[in-house]
Amino acid sequence: MTTRIKVDLRSDTVTRPDEPMRRAMHEAVVGDDVLGDDPTVQELEARYAELVGKEAALFTPSGSMANQIAVAAWTRGGDEIICGAQCHILEYEYGAPAFLARVLAREAPVRQGSPDPDAVRAFYKSGAFHSSRTSLLCLENTHNRLGGVIADQGLFEEL
């Protein structure tokens, strides 16, 4: 007998915690994360840093916040970023790259859930004479507006 599990990858907002998850949230030891006193957040950040092979990790309560921190950290005011068409940063984050990081977002056509590498090459700007500098390529996986499609890993590698 085959068991089918439905996984909805459109957005983190469509997830629903089951009873064991709710129990874990209820029983979690908490503290003030701003003061560095929340052991649950500390454990989560340490586990994730180890998982991805980094020195440290930062918990953010939303994907939008994580996106905007990354954009601000990897760019300077006046830079350009390239995003895939209909990506979350462009469609659902209220112009935050322009407002918070002071960068212009360019929208590249998407192929199989990924910005098209040929379009990205065509849009890239070095920052030479009278042009802004492309400083960041934003990749979304899974692609929200395309129904949660998983981006083609080969295209990501090409980028």
Which role does the model predict for each range below?
Residues 2-3, 49-52, 73-75, 98-100, ...:
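Solvent-exposed alpha-helices and their adjacent loops that cap or buttress functional pockets
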Residues 1-24:
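N-terminal amphipathic/basic leader segments beginning at the initiator methionine
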Residues 101-158:
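PLP-dependent aminotransferase-class I/II
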